[in-house]
Amino acid sequence: MEKFVSVTNPKVIENLKLQISNSRIIDWASDFNKDAGITYNRLAYILDYWKNKFSWEKSEKELNSFNQFYFIDEGIKTHFLHIKSPKKNALPLLLIHGWPGSIFEFFDLIPLLTNPKDNNLLGCQPFDIVIPSLPNVGFSFFTDQKPMDLVEISNHFLTLMKNLGYENYFVQGGDLGSFIASIMSKNDSKSVKGIHLNLLPLPRGLGKIPNNNEGKIYY
């Protein structure tokens, strides 16, 4: 594990804003309806937001308020947050974001999950939280740029939790994270004691009952 703190050169931000300023929205885009892709007005709003309203400095400061680390395994360098609850009865919980998405989705939940009592959530279970960025999202990347499928990502997160010393834990996944959480539970049901999904992955051909026993159980 490596400790991590995000430090961005201001020139990188200046260059990004310059590129946004030099962006040109083609005139005929204004004739498109939403079924043909992004509309002119929507794209203009996004460009203006990124140039004049979004503050990476503020977001980076918020990110750095949490404990961040790098986990390196077999050419995969995964950025993750690890926030421990002050409560002794806390249970470990892995939170997995979707795509497009990021670990920023969970920031508002962190104090509620790690210290519910002090946030007016009396009687709620506290958690020690692990929040990884998916491969090639944010500060996570492959050192050799080798693509990963969902099973490989799931196994990588199982290894991450094992290296953090968690023998038993819970997993929450949304969007793409739902698939990863489901695979983790299937591949290591001994360690993964329960999962919570924002999206329910369903097999293809749901109307047909599988012939094999494993398929019937999944159905």
Could you say what each language-model-derived stretch is?
Residues 8-11, 38, 148:
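Short coil/turn linker and secondary-structure boundary residues
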